[in-house]
Amino acid sequence: MRTWLWKVVLADGTRTLTTAGRWAEALAHIEEHRGIGQRMLDGRQVAVLAALSHTPTDGAALITMTTPGERWENAVTGCLDVMCRKALRGSAVPLLDRLVEDYVEHQPDQGMTVFDTRLGLTILDLLEPYQEDAAHRMVAELHRRAAVATDGYAARECLADHRFTSLAEPHQVEAARRLVHTCALGRGGLPEPWLARMTEALRGRDEVIRASVGHSRPQQEGLVYRAEV
């Protein structure tokens, strides 16, 4: 439970700060809770992105020292590497070509559709303007994956991306819109029975978190250390 709570504090705090664009504070939050590991997980991603705006050489150094992980981690590392190379005025085209090939050749794991879509859109947006063939391949693959998964969230992510909508065929854009509509996204409410069940689950989780925080305060420092190990 304590390890779980440490992860929640680390992840939710980081997500809140980065969503607000407060990257320096997000990095300080992660460092305070010892959340920067050797693999390209949330903490290390934030550290690289925080460095990009001021000292991209530090971001590049973090990438170089990153321990390879699962395929999706390596893809994220590749995207951040491209961003660092561009910030340092270096060539990123060969790396972008590899990212496109790897994305098209490997299908997403179960439960990773939205993440996979965001990854694909990131690669698409990083492509140079003259990489038109690669960009059209990415758009076609993103459209195909959202359609096969019948995932409205994935379709909505695609529609929110300007480069996707500017390159996609009209029928692809329309298909994505129909999928979002079919999945009832943006309707503004939940049926009352579902809302009641969700409220009950959230209330129970709130009680568990408050009880855990109250019991763990006297030994907080030891908790953080053990959670990191």
Residue ranges, per PLM feature:
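Long, charge-rich C-terminal accessory regions
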Residues: S53-L179
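Short, flexible helix-coil linker/hinge segments at the edges of structured domains or between repeats
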Residues: M1-V8, L27-G35, M40
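C-terminal functional modules
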Residues: L142-V229
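Alpha-helical protein-protein interaction scaffolds
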Residues: V9, G13-E31
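Central/C-terminal regulatory/activation regions of fungal transcription factors
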Residues: I36-R39, A47-T57
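Structural signature of alpha-solenoid helical repeat junctions
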Residues: R2-L5, R39, T113-F115, L190, ...
